């Protein structure tokens, strides 16, 4: 195989691997409704995106207990977070501390 042919084959392999990795990532939706996260617990994989939609008329946050991320969701807006590591992630709303959620993230 020529050098050009080998380069093309490597390029195709890289593009396919990248596309497969992107295709496997999911978007998981959580609603902020009636001062609660719905669903309160979700399962995700590393690389998945969690999208919170604030359906309430007041602002909320999705704030990790370990303070590694803090998302402000204005009324009728969405915010998102890409899961970066496996494990249990507890989060809450800073404005409404009884509003709690959990992400169970796997590799």
Role assignments for model-derived ranges:
Residues 2-14, 19-107:
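Extracytoplasmic copper-binding redox domains, predominantly the cupredoxin/blue-copper superfamily
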